[in-house]
Amino acid sequence: SYHDDALARLDEGFRAVKFTPFEGTNAGYSMAHGRRVEARVSAVREAVGDEIGMAIDGHGLLSPINAMEMAKRIEPYGVLFFEEPVLPEHLDAMADIRRTARIPIATGERLFTRYPFKELLVKEAVDVIQADVGNAGGILEVYKIAAMAEAFYVTMAPHNPWSPLSTAISLHLDAVIPTFIIQEITTALAPPSALN
């Protein structure tokens, strides 16, 4: 269950959790789905308490109107951020969601080089940048993205579901980013047989 999974992460020493409470794609959205999403978020908040960070990953599954509705539903639970409520290429929709939501909006794992990040920042479409050192162009490129973000009062929570090497690289980069808030890491790596 969501509750038990959250408790397991706490037992592992994590001080924040990120999860996806959504089902399928936007085509399956209904009021009942919205209530189930809210129940999952509530269960995790109950499990981790108020001192542990909680981020919600939308995986770009929602339409703008449904993302706005979901932002309202999860707002009372004190989330760190709502990641990719819509796909990042929909900049105007992301900006609209950010203006209406009362929770931080995050994106960036699917963006490459600093140029699309610049558009996000200029359109005021994001509160938290999730540049991925492996996807966005390497250490220097992510550092440049972070410098741009700082000028817009936007924080950094780098994306990283990869290997221990990319985790180490990301952590070194985090140490020099003034607006760094949290680093994503994976809790398990695929066994070598999965790579064959």
Go through each PLM region and give its residues:
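Metal-dependent enolase-superfamily TIM-barrel catalytic cores that perform enediolate-based chemistry
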Residues: 1-100
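Shared catalytic-loop signature of beta/alpha-barrel
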Residues: 72, 78-81, 89-196
